[in-house]
Amino acid sequence: MAKKLTKKTKAALGSFDPKQIYDLDKAIEIAKKTATTKFESSIDIAIKLNLDTTKADQQLRGAISLPHNVSKPIRILAITDQQAEAKQAGADFVGEIDKINEIKAGWMDFDVIITNPKFMIELGKLGKILGPKGLMPNPKTGTVTQDIATAITEYRKGKKEYRTDTFGNIHMTVGKQSTDTNKIVENANALIDLIKSRRPSAVKGVYIQNISVSSTMGPGVKVKIN
């Protein structure tokens, strides 16, 4: 049985034309106005790509430092032999094999792991623990690096990871309901430009199929693709 729409959702859907494609700034304004949550909504972007994600070279993954930080504070675990540098850069937890053993024992009170390449052999053994939660460090996201301090600083300033899902979609929060619309536009364009630059050479035809923005639990608003 189809779920009945709430009055708020019906009102939100009735306030704009869901079939129309809007300029990015207008779409963001609509997304803000159609938010239906009692708490402050985030503004999210969804980019649908023409990718065959069964092929490794068409699985996009990486990280981006948006022009305007909209990330919640995160807990950073640094597994490194550069412990003084990691602490100075702002890591919440620092260690080596001791921290890996804590993870094996069930400790998961962190949001990102940044590590040196030398520790990836041991961390790789935790694939069944870290993989499903998206916590396995990866060179593509800058979380496997020799420059621990720089990586920690970037993530502390709001660096965000992105990756395609099974259907070739990329989702990211690019602002909050209270964020200035121009700042959200700049964040969204930064992500769109990066995704355009990452187009796999094997992709034929239209690469970006559609873009939409929405508030938390709000309706999607279609965006013009430039």
UniProtKB/Swiss-Prot annotation:
Gene3D superfamilies: 3.30.190.20, 3.40.50.790. One of its GO terms (cellular component) is large ribosomal subunit. Signal peptide: none annotated. GO terms for biological process: regulation of translation; translation. GO terms for molecular function: rRNA binding; structural constituent of ribosome; tRNA binding. Part of the 50S ribosomal subunit. HAMAP family: Ribosomal_uL1_B. Belongs to the universal ribosomal protein uL1 family. This is Large ribosomal subunit protein uL1.
